Amino acid sequence: MDQEAGFMVNFINSYFIALGVLIGGALIGGLGAYLAGEPPLTAITKLANRLKIWALVAAIGGTFDAVYSFERGILEGNTRDIFKQLLLIISAMGGAQSGWLIISWLTQEHLSS
């Protein structure tokens, strides 16, 4: 995430980036499944389940920023950076979970099982 922007901006961006990656990836993947002759709603549900971790990684800006923040927090005693990074990860997890829930509501795939 951008270090110059305020923390709340990064917090909100993290949520919506994860939400967008999950919903967008699942819907575009469902379109691809439809064009390939496969059931699109089933494909959307499966993709949403598989994209949760990638939405999280995309939202926090890759793994190196997170590792660097944890390293700085542990080695330099700057616990504020660790706390901020944990909050960003929780925000991204919330966005990914919200996206998965929206996809689940749209597809209603869990009802057909």
Curated annotation (Swiss-Prot):
<protein>
    <recommendedName>
        <fullName>Sporulation membrane protein YtrH</fullName>
    </recommendedName>
</protein>
<comment type="function">
    <text>Involved in sporulation. May contribute to cortex formation or stability.</text>
</comment>
<feature type="transmembrane region" description="Helical">
    <location>
        <begin position="51"/>
        <end position="71"/>
    </location>
</feature>
<dbReference type="Pfam" id="PF14034">
    <property type="entry name" value="Spore_YtrH"/>
</dbReference>
<keyword id="KW-0812">Transmembrane</keyword>
<keyword id="KW-0472">Membrane</keyword>
<keyword id="KW-0749">Sporulation</keyword>
<feature type="transmembrane region" description="Helical">
    <location>
        <begin position="86"/>
        <end position="106"/>
    </location>
</feature>
<feature type="transmembrane region" description="Helical">
    <location>
        <begin position="16"/>
        <end position="36"/>
    </location>
</feature>
<keyword id="KW-1133">Transmembrane helix</keyword>
<dbReference type="GO" id="GO:0016020">
    <property type="term" value="C:membrane"/>
</dbReference>
<dbReference type="GO" id="GO:0030435">
    <property type="term" value="P:sporulation resulting in formation of a cellular spore"/>
</dbReference>
<dbReference type="InterPro" id="IPR025689">
    <property type="entry name" value="Spore_YtrH"/>
</dbReference>
